[in-house]
Every structure is written in C-alpha cells, then in structure tokens.
C-alpha cells in the first residue's frame, strides 16, 4: 500500500535531511527551502527510499507552486466605497453623472439626466437644460452684446448683478401686502447674495455669484441660483444654474454647483 511523504529541504545542505510526516497541512516555505513529496510503499519504506522515489503529479506540483506564489505576492484589493461597484480590473472610472456640452464660444458640464428645453426666459438665451423630474432645477446660458471689455468693467460682482437682476425674476405683484418670513412691506420676493468670487481663466476675468431667492408663495423654501459670467469679443456670457432649496439639500447641490463652475469660454 502506497503513502505520500513530504520533506523540507534546505539548498545549503549537501545531503537532504528528512523531516517528520506532514498530514493534511502544507507548511509555509521560506525562499531557501524546497518542498519535495515522495511516494513510498509502507511495507518496504527503508528499501525503497532511495530507489523508488516518485515525484508528485504535475497537477499537484502546479497547485503547490500557485499556492506558494499567492502567499508570497501582495494582491491589492479593488477600491470600492460602500454602495459602489469595485474597480476589479483597475480601469479608470469615468464620471457618468455629467456630459460635456460644447456651445458657440463656450462649454460646460451638464447633468446627464437633464434634458434640453426650448423655453426662452431671458434675453440672448441660447441654451436651457432642466431636470427630468423637476423643472425648477435647470441651467441656462445667455449671450448678449456689450460694450464692456471685461466683466470687471461692470463694477463689483454685486454691482454687476444689479444690472442683470432680470436673471433672478422680477416681482410681478405691486399691491399692498405684508408677508411673513422676513419680507418687507409690499414685497413678496427677496434675494440674498450668499457668496461672490472672481477668477482669471485663460486670461479672462470671471464673476461667480451664489444667490438665494425667496418668494412669499414659494413651496420650495426658495431657490439657490449660481451665476457665472464673463466678457469676450464684445459679448457678455452668462451661465445660471439653479435648484429649489429643498432639493438643494437632497442632492441637487452637487449638480448645480458643478454645472455653474464648469462654465468657461471655449
């Protein structure tokens, strides 16, 4: 009856030393050790030790080599946050939440789930995209002639906004009223400038404004409107992206901010 014995050999030794029989567990190997398995006959082990030693099968040897390689190598786990698919093959991930739009003299990133709309609200409007499920979340681009050489010729960002306040919507009601919610008498709409900044991109000055507008009858708690503006070749370029206040804090902020800040001259 045949049995299998495994011996651990050190390359430094001229005569291999026999180790005890390993049953069911393959020992860990160092780089200067070799695992040799020999088939022996139980009935005549001493006589057959030097004569009838048989190497393990190719399949077993291959299995041992693969196992040793796996132990000796470092495998980097696929990166994946909770709820995201693992990048198993290491290919770079692309942001599918946005699509690049190249217009006449400008470009920007638009949320992939927003659809084009032909509605025109503002002078010189050349583009409008809106959320599939909520038209309040949208972006427009308007291009109008100007005699200004730079956006800074309009004054400060706040002074510029006062000259294009039609972007925020005009108050249509002109009667007597006292509305709750911090509105002045006879006013049913209010706009608060939350943030302004300037930047130079490609040698051109840009204004960036973040505005919160509220109306007395609004059911969204107001609108967050982000405006990016610049001047080039006698044209005033304005990009305005917005979302309702409630949706702003439920995920719309990411899409509106990325859209407005991605706008630039082409």
Swiss-Prot record:
It is found in: Plastid, Chloroplast thylakoid membrane. The keyword Oxidoreductase does not apply. GO terms for biological process: photosynthesis. InterPro entries: Mog1/PsbP_a/b/a-sand, PsbP_C. Its main location: plastid. One of its GO terms (cellular component) is extrinsic component of membrane. Keywords: Chloroplast, Membrane, Photosynthesis, Photosystem II, Plastid, Thylakoid, Transit peptide. The keyword Chloroplast applies. Residues 1-80 form a transit peptide. One of its GO terms (molecular function) is calcium ion binding. May be involved in the regulation of photosystem II. Belongs to the PsbP family. This is Oxygen-evolving enhancer protein 2-3, chloroplastic. It comes from Nicotiana tabacum (Common tobacco). The lineage of its organism: Eukaryota, Viridiplantae, Streptophyta, Embryophyta, Tracheophyta. The gene is PSBP3.
């Amino acid at each position: 009856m045949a049995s299998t014995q495994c011996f651990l050999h050190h390359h430094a030794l001229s005569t291999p030393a026999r180790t005890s029989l390993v049953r069911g567990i393959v020992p860990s190997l160092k780089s200067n050790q070799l695992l040799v398995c020999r088939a022996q006959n139980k009935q005549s082990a001493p006589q057959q030790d030097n004569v009838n030693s048989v190497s393990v099968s190719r399949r077993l040897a291959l299995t041992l080599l693969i196992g040793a390689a796996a132990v000796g190598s470092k495998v980097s786990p696929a990166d994946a946050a909770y709820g995201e698919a693992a990048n198993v093959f290491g290919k770079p991930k692309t942001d599918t939440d946005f699509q690049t739009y190249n217009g006449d003299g400008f470009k920007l990133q638009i949320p992939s789930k927003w659809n084009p709309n032909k509605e025109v609200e503002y002078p010189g409007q050349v583009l409008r995209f809106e959320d599939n499920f909520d038209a309040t979340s949208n972006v427009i681009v308007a291009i109008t002639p100007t005699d200004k050489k730079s956006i800074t010729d309009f004054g400060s960002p706040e002074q510029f906004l006062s000259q294009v306040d039609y972007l925020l919507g005009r108050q249509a009601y002109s009667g007597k009223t006292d509305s709750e919610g911090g509105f002045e008498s006879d006013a049913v709409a209010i706009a608060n400038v939350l943030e302004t900044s300037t930047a130079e991109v490609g040698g051109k000055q840009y204004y960036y404004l973040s505005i919160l507008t509220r109306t007395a009858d609004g059911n969204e708690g107001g609108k967050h409107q982000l405006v990016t503006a610049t001047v080039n070749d006698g044209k005033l370029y304005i990009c305005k992206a917005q979302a309702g206040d409630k949706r702003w804090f439920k995920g719309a902020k990411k899409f509106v901010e990325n859209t407005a800040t991605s706008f630039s001259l082409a």
